[in-house]
Every structure is written in structure tokens, then in C-alpha cells.
From Swiss-Prot:
It comes from the Eukaryota. It comes from Karenia brevis. The gene is psbU. Disulfide bonds: none annotated. The lineage of its organism: Eukaryota, Sar, Alveolata, Dinophyceae, Gymnodiniales. Keywords: Chloroplast, Electron transport, Membrane, Photosynthesis, Photosystem II, Plastid, Thylakoid, Transit peptide, Transport. GO terms for biological process: photosynthesis; photosystem II stabilization. This is Photosystem II extrinsic protein U, chloroplastic.
Length: 159
């Protein structure tokens, strides 16, 4: 699949180079006579455009994106929260958690379990007391790069 993608990239570059060559034959004729070309420039350009068109149609690769994440409900849509993947805004629903304790949970993860979370999160005594109220709601699933990258800033801004 990568070979096909590389071929497509090469063919696309060749198409761009052809776009900047003179469109009509004989616009800048030299003063002396040249030997007749075996294949005319126009025919070569037409052949190249057909090859590129066929390559684009036949070689279009499907995206390998992860479409469905099984635990998406735990990112804020369910009672339980996946601590390793949830965005900081999810903790706004939990009184006293946002922004201080939630920020520390998101910054110092990922965690294996509750014990690991309390050891790594660097919570103050007050924050730890607040977080303990919600222990039953926390899950510790495997971190997914698609969600960990947005733990602190999901890029959604209000006007």
C-alpha cells in the first residue's frame, strides 16, 4: 500500500512539472533547424495526463483512520470517566474537580489504577479529598494517542 502511495506522489510531482512547460509547440522556435523529435511534446503531454488520471483513479488508497473507539462513552458521555483519555472539560461535571484537581489528573497521567493515580497526580490534601468522592466513577483504560493529545486543550473555543 505504501508503494502505491509513493508511486502516486511521484506521478503527482511529474504532473506539476508538466504544468509549467510551454503549452503550445513552436512558440519559442530556435533560429536554427532542430532534428525532428520522435514523439511530439503534445502527444507526450497527453500520454502523461492519461497515465496520471488512471493512476489517480486506480491507486486511490483508503484512509486507515480509526473510525470507532469502543470506549468513546467514557470520554464524557457516561457516568464513568476514562481518566487516561478524557479531556479536562469532562471534569467540569464533577463539583470541585475543575480546574485544579482535573488539571493535575490530565497532566500527570497515564495511570494504571487508582493507587497509581494518587501516587503520580501530585494532588494536595484538599484535592485528594475531592477526588476520592468520585473514585467509583473512574476507569483506567489504555491511553489512545488520538485522545491523550487533547487532554488539556481540545481546541473548542466559544465566542
Amino acid at each position: 500500500m505504501q508503494k502505491m502511495a509513493m508511486l502516486m506522489a511521484c506521478l503527482a510531482c511529474m504532473g506539476l512539472a508538466a504544468a509549467f512547460s510551454p503549452a503550445t509547440l513552436g512558440v519559442n522556435k530556435p533560429s536554427h533547424r532542430q532534428q525532428a523529435p520522435v514523439m511530439s511534446q503534445v502527444a507526450r503531454r497527453e500520454l502523461l495526463s492519461k497515465v496520471l488520471g488512471a493512476a489517480a483513479l486506480l491507486g486511490a488508497a483508503s484512509a486507515d483512520a480509526k473510525v470507532n473507539y469502543d470506549a468513546v462513552a467514557y470520554l464524557g458521555g457516561a457516568q464513568q470517566i476514562d481518566v487516561n483519555n478524557a479531556n479536562i472539560r469532562v471534569y467540569q461535571k464533577l463539583p470541585g474537580m475543575y480546574p485544579s484537581a482535573a488539571g493535575k489528573l490530565c497532566t500527570n497521567g497515564p495511570y494504571v489504577d487508582l493507587k497509581d493515580m494518587y501516587a503520580k497526580a501530585k494532588l494536595s490534601k484538599e484535592e485528594e479529598a475531592i477526588v476520592k468522592e468520585f473514585d467509583k466513577d473512574f476507569l483506567f483504560l489504555k491511553p489512545q494517542i488520538e485522545y491523550v493529545v487533547d487532554n488539556l486543550n481540545n481546541g473548542l473555543y466559544r465566542r
